[in-house]
Amino acid sequence: VYDVSVNGKRVGNHELKPGWTDYRKEVSFQVFDIAPLLRKGKNEIQVQLSRGWWAGEISREVYGAHPQLSLWARIEVDGSCVAKTDSTWVYSLNGPLIAGDIYDGEIYDARRVPADWESAVENKSVQVSLVPFEGPEVRVRDEHLWQKPQSIVIYHDTVDTGTKYGK
């Protein structure tokens, strides 16, 4: 599970990206238009990557103990490539996202600043098909779709519920 930002602004508006897949067979990719997030000069792409589908409780490290990421960006103007990602990627395992898992939730410590940056390494041993992600995107529901409770009942004792629970 990942989240991408360009120059500090989030890319896309859906959650639990990219959706589950059997990583032994194929890896889903997603495409985003980041043109509105770019600025003149230097731009920064950041990714927060959790154990999620790859190594979290849902898969119990079947695919590996540490999540892996492949990201490729290509900037085109009038059909011509003017910039693209290269081999200068760096990463840190000491960022604010401590844990993120669909079953166990997320632990995020905003006080932690990524440190101990290391150069990313290309893993050529992975031999699976890349396929476009297919399926519905997970989105946070709009507030107008939330339902308000119809009634609230507060029980003060087991007697109020009409049960004895071992008494």
Describe each PLM feature range:
Residues V1-E122:
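Accessory beta-strand-rich segments of carbohydrate-active enzymes
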